[in-house]
């Protein structure tokens, strides 16, 4: 299955798993709103930023399964097959990720709308990678560890 991040967002839309918010939302409120939502949230209007933020993409089993293109019960099989036959990465000349490229002095990380996840955080952090681990007794788990 070939898919892009945009395809995944559209899949969430079609399956009523995405709530799009057009009214202005302060970036400091994003994490709290995501925690309260049963859907993934797409914030289209963050004052001070020129790009949207989407969050909550992996907060439900249904959304994970939709992203993988399988029913929930088949996630383990799909992951197992992918791990048994990994696909080598390849460079491509054109891709959506290459639509906007900043280099040199044009790079400014403060342009990115990076939320604060907890009141105890020292400030905004780019974090929250997904770790997939397999335990012989309990099976496969996907988690976010900071």
Task: Show where each model-derived region lies.
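Extended, highly charged
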Residues: 1-146
């Amino acid at each position: 299955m070939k898919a892009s991040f945009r395809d995944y967002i559209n899949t969430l839309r079609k399956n009523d798993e995405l709530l799009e918010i057009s009214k202005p939302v302060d970036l400091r409120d994003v994490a709290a709103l995501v925690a309260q939502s049963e859907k993934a949230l797409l914030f289209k209007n963050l004052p001070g930023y020129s790009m949207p933020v989407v969050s909550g993409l992996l907060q439900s089993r249904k959304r994970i399964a939709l992203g993988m293109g399988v029913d929930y019960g088949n996630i383990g099989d799909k992951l197992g097959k992918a791990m048994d036959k990994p696909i080598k990465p390849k460079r491509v000349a054109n891709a959506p990720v290459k639509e906007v490229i900043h280099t040199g002095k044009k790079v400014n990380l403060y342009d990115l709308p990076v939320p604060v996840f907890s009141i105890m955080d020292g400030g905004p952090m780019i974090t929250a990678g997904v770790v997939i681990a397999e335990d012989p007794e309990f099976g496969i788990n996907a988690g976010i560890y900071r």
